[in-house]
Amino acid sequence: MAAAPDLSALEARIGHRFSAADLIEAALTHVSAAQGKRVSYQRLEFLGDRVLGVVVANMLYGAFPDADEGELSRRLADLVRKESCAEVALEWGVEAYVRVGESEKQNASVNRAILGDVCESIIGAVFLDGGFAPAQRVVTQAFEPRMRSPRRPLRDPKTTLQEWAQARGLPPPSYRETARTGPDHAPEFTISVEIAGFQQAEARGFAKRLAEQAAAAAFLTREKIVEPGDRKGAA
């Protein structure tokens, strides 16, 4: 099978360097891609869901001393729902690293749900790798900003990039497959994205759609674009 993209960049975005590489590998593997000795993220997701709930509940308890149990429960449910976890996973850029089977690669809605699961599985992996303190730090870094400020739903990177280009009168982003490695049953794609007047960005993923999203995310990061109209990109 093709080698996974460099995990050090992902670890830097998560905020934890893994001592046990098998934990982060498992956290990124959907059950549809678990074959032979490869373990899926299901058990880690179960654990991460509980760790996430405890850390966020503790954050809310300290941040809102006048809130009653009902308000705290509503805030907790909003922060730890799958959509919120998927947003965190997108911010971490996990879509380029997730391993899924062929049956899942073309299902965008399932992949969105998978991203939420992977966020929780990564939290579980951090907990097993380093204990509660590192897991608390990772969760706090990712979820505390959501707790303290209302926000618009995070768009996927391809949509954000296309809207950014359109708002500036630029041609739409152009995606191109530049390499394909690995066996036929588990290929890894390298995709580049280009907008006229800008340097292309490139990323890898275990499905074309995921590699395109990762390339768009790389472009957005390099040009310091958050949402169209929210922050100016390069001139």
Curated annotation (Swiss-Prot):
Task: Show the active-site residues.
Answer: D49, E120
Instruction: Report the record's Gene Ontology biological process terms.
Output: mRNA processing; regulation of gene expression; rRNA processing; tRNA processing
* MF annotations from Gene Ontology: double-stranded RNA binding; metal ion binding; ribonuclease III activity; rRNA binding
- Which keywords are on file for this protein? Cytoplasm, Endonuclease, Hydrolase, Magnesium, Metal-binding, mRNA processing, Nuclease, RNA-binding, rRNA processing, rRNA-binding, tRNA processing
The record places domain RNase III at 7-131
Q: How does it assemble?
A: Homodimer.
Protein name, UniProt field: Ribonuclease 3
Q: Gene behind this chain?
A: rnc
